[in-house]
């Protein structure tokens, strides 16, 4: 009897393999992988069982401007890759549920601050992310529960790249005899 495919498990594996490849790429690019003044956009090509191909497309000080740049959508489309990922770094600090005043302190000024690196990816229409801390070996994964402005900007870029693919396909069909 065949075991049914668990798509969430498959996506979890995809997320982890792409995250590992992106982390390896970042770590090969710099000696300070948790301290970058720019967000990075990567094209990602992945087929299960293969090593993901990762290519740097753009860097920008403002992740939202980078994701909103139509040229980056064209570069992703031209890459022919089936996904993309963004990486950004910063500070994280614990949230004090009992004392809202402590939550007013910027993470970079908080006494318990930690350096963090966030990788968020879109692959075949699904979004996932990973969070890594400098002082921790383990990685925290989120398989599709992303919400907020970054998730919206990622979805918008994905939609533009898809529209380019659809437009290109229709253009090629019109040229056939």
Model-based region annotation:
Residues 37-42, 81-83, 114-118:
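Short, surface-exposed beta-edge/turn micro-motifs
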Residues 2-9, 58-59, 75, 139-153:
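Compact, glycine/acidic-enriched structural inserts
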Residues 99-177:
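Glycine-rich, aromatic-bearing surface loops/beta-hairpins
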């Amino acid at each position: 009897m065949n075991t049914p495919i668990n798509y969430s498990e498959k996506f979890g594996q995809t997320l982890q393999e792409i995250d590992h490849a992106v982390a390896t790429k970042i770590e090969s690019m710099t000696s300070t992988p948790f301290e970058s003044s720019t967000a990075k956009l990567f094209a990602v090509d992945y087929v299960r069982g293969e090593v993901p191909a990762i290519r740097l497309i753009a860097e920008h000080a403002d992740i939202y401007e980078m994701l909103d740049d139509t040229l980056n959508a064209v570069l992703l489309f031209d890459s022919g890759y089936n996904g993309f990922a963004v990486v950004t770094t910063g500070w994280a600090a614990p949230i004090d549920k009992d004392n809202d005043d402590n939550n007013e302190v910027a993470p970079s000024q908080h006494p318990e601050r930690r350096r963090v690196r966030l990788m968020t990816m879109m692959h075949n229409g699904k979004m996932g992310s990973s969070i890594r801390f400098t002082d921790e070996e383990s990685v925290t994964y989120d398989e599709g529960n992303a919400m907020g402005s970054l998730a919206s900007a990622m979805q918008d870029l994905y939609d533009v790249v898809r529209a380019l693919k659809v437009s290109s396909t229709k253009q090629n069909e019109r040229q056939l005899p």
